[in-house]
Every structure is written in structure tokens, then in C-alpha cells.
Regions:
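An anion-binding loop in the catalytic cleft
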Residues: 21, 26-141
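Donor/substrate-binding cores of folate-linked one-carbon enzymes
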Residues: 1-14, 18-20
Length: 141
């Protein structure tokens, strides 16, 4: 095979991941949040704060369903998943983990840590992973 020259105008830069990438922003579309959960699986993971506790998300999927709820509002919570309103669509949380616990299917998680319909989960800004210009380097210590 012959080398194919790349179009320099389409170059993107990726930065290193860190713990500040973990919090989720439910104001984004459900598809974007679900892709972020998948991208950050393992470390640093994806999290949201609820009642002062950081909950880690192990698996989620986006649904195109329309929701009239405020982004972050819990629409339903049962064994099939916790449905959370997003900026566009609905995010279904499938696996959750409390601090110091293990990752559980949502049905088992809800048995020990109920999430009530109507409660709102905290959103946090999700910084971009890629850019068209290089990211600034942190100063060396």
C-alpha cells in the first residue's frame, strides 16, 4: 500500500484526560452525554452529583424521545433504567456506582440508593477533548 497524504486543514488535536472530565452536563443532547460515558469508561469515568454524593455512571444510552423536563430532571427510575431529561432527548442510565461500592445494574443500585422521579441531577460543564488548535501545555513544575 502507498502512503496517502493527509489534508492538513482537517487536523485535530486531542488533550490528555484528567479527573475534571468526569462530571456530566445534562444540558447537552442525550446522544452526546451517552457517547461521553462510553469514551470515559474506566478512568476517569463519568459522574454526577446527587444529594452531596458523587455517583459514577458505568453505562448509558441516549433516546430520541422528547421530554418537557428541565435538563437533569429524573423522569423515571426503575429496573430498566433511570431516565434523565437532557437538552435534547432522554439519557437512560443503566449502571451506577456509589463511592466505595461496586458498579451495579440500575435495578440493584436503586434498591440501596433510591432516585426519586422529579429530582434534578447536577450538571457540570464538559470540556472538549479535541480542538483544531493545539491545547496549551501545563507549566512544568
Amino acid at each position: 500500500s502507498k502512503p496517502v497524504p493527509q489534508d492538513e486543514a482537517l487536523v485535530t488535536y486531542a488533550r490528555r484526560l484528567n479527573r475534571t472530565d468526569a462530571p456530566l452536563d445534562f444540558r447537552q443532547s442525550a446522544a452526546v452525554v451517552a457517547q461521553r460515558v462510553l469514551a470515559l469508561e474506566g478512568w476517569p469515568g463519568s459522574t454526577f452529583e446527587h444529594r452531596g454524593v458523587m455517583i459514577k455512571v458505568g453505562a448509558a444510552r441516549g433516546e430520541d424521545a422528547t421530554s418537557s423536563g428541565t435538563p437533569g430532571r429524573i423522569l423515571s427510575a426503575d429496573r430498566s433504567g433511570v431516565r434523565v431529561a437532557c437538552g435534547q432527548g432522554v439519557l437512560v442510565l443503566l449502571q451506577l456506582q456509589r463511592p466505595g461500592g461496586k458498579m451495579l445494574p440500575v435495578g440493584e443500585f436503586l434498591a440501596g440508593f433510591p432516585l426519586a422521579v422529579g429530582e434534578t441531577l447536577a450538571s457540570a460543564e464538559m470540556p472538549a477533548f479535541v480542538a483544531t488548535a493545539p491545547f496549551p501545555r501545563a507549566p512544568k513544575a
